[in-house]
Curated annotation (Swiss-Prot):
The lineage of its organism: Eukaryota, Viridiplantae, Streptophyta, Embryophyta, Tracheophyta. Keywords: Membrane, Signal, Transmembrane, Transmembrane helix. The chain crosses the membrane at residues 444-464. This is Protein disulfide isomerase-like 5-4. GO terms for cellular component: COPII-coated ER to Golgi transport vesicle; endoplasmic reticulum; membrane.
Amino acid sequence: MISSSKLKSVDFYRKIPRDLTEASLSGAGLSIVAALAMVFLFGMELSNYLAVNTSTSVIVDRSSDGEFLRIDFNLSFPALSCEFASVDVSDVLGTNRLNITKTVRKYSIDRNLVPTGSEFHPGPIPTVSKHGDDVEENHDDGSVPLSSRNFDSYSHQYPVLVVNFYAPWCYWSNRLKPSWEKTAKIMRERYDPEMDGRIILAKVDCTEEIDLCRRHHIQGYPSIRIFRKGSDLKENQGHHDHESYYGDRDTESLVAAMETYVANIPKDAHVLALEDKSNKTVDPAKRPAPLTSGCRIEGFVRVKKVPGSVVISARSGSHSFDPSQINVSHYVTQFSFGKRLSAKMFNELKRLTPYVGGHHDRLAGQSYIVKHGDVNANVTIEHYLQIVKTELVTLRSSKELKLVEEYEYTAHSSLVHSFYVPVVKFHFEPSPMQVLVTELPKSFSHFITNVCAIIGGVFTVAGILDSIFHNTLRLVKKVELGKNI
C-alpha cells in the first residue's frame, strides 16, 4: 500500500506557512484588479458562448415544397363589386387559371372598408348560352326608358320593376335588345300597366344616366336588376345583395323568368303599391343601395416556381365593362409567399438572423388609391415582386436538424394608363438561388478551456507583475540605503 508521505511528494501545490509570507498594499490592490479582470473576461467568454454564430451561403434552390409556391393574400377594393371580381393566375409556361373560387373568399365592404355582411356567396351562376333571339327582328320599344327623374317613381309604383342597365356600344347589350323589347311587349299584353300593373320592364342607358348607374353600382353591361317596392336589395344570412337576373337572354327564357317574379303577387298589388307611394314613410329594411360597393378578397393560390402573375379584375363571359367606370384602388392587408410561420418559428428565425423577416410581407399596410375622374380613368395598378428564399438550418438541444423556410421579396409598383379594363397585377419572379443560413455549434469543452485559460492567465500575469513591482521597490530601497552610508 502506498504511504501518505509518498502521495504528498507529488503535490504540485505545496503550502508555505502563513507566518513565512508577507502581505503588502500593492499586492492587495493588484489582487483586486486581477479578480475584476477575471470576472469581466469570464462574462465576455460566456456571452460569446451563448451568442449565435452562423455562416451564410448562396446555393441553388432546394425547396422541400417541390415546384409549387403558395401565395397568401388579403386585399380590399372599395370600388370593385364582388359580383364581378375575379382572381386569375398565369405564368410563362402557359398556365392560365381564371376566376379561382375554391381557395378564395369574398366579403362585401363599403367605401370605408367596413364589412356589410357575411361571406359573399353569388351561388351557381349559369353559363349564358343564349344572348338573344337567333333571328333579330325589328320591334318597337316595349320597355320604358328611365332616367334619374322618373326612376324612383316607377320603382315604387309597380310591385316588380325589371330594369336593363345597358350601354349602346356594348356587344352583349345589342344582342339582348331585340329579345328584351319583345319580352317587354309580351309582359305589357299579359299584365297591362293600367289594369294589372304587377310587373313592368324598363331600361336605362348608362352612357346618358351615368350618375343613376353609379348609384346602383352598375359595372357590367347589360345588368338586369329586379326591384321590388323600390329596392333591388335582398337579404341572405345577414348579407345584402343586389337581386339580378343571370339566365339565358332569349325571349322564351326571359318571359319564363318574368312569370316567376309575379307568380306570388296578387292582382290588386298594383293598387297597394300606389297607396304605398302616397305614404312618405320609408321601410328601413328597404333602404337604397349604397353609392359604392366594395369587396375584400382573401385566400391563397398555389403557383409554379416560374415567373407569372396574379391578376384581380372585373370579369364576366356575358357582360361588357366601361373601362372609365372601373376603379381598382386597393388596400393590402397581406401578400406573402410560402407557408405561414408560427410565432415559435418566427422567434427562432429572429434569433438566428435578426435582419431576416422584415420583407416577408413587404406590401402589408400599403394603399394604392386612384381618384375617380377623367384624368385618372383607365388606370391599371401593377406590382413587380422579386422573391428570394432563405433557409435556416439550426441545431438545438433536441439535437435534431430543423429547417425553417422563409420567402422575402422586393416590391416596385406603378400606375399605368390603358385603353383596356383596369386590373391589378402582381407580377412575381422567384429566384433560382436561395440563401442558406447555418448555425455553427460551439463546443462546451472549448468554453471550459477558455475559462481556465482566462483564470490561470490572469492569475499568472498578476503574480508576475506583483513580483516585478515588489522586487523593484526592494531594489530602490537598497540603493537609497547605500547612498546614505
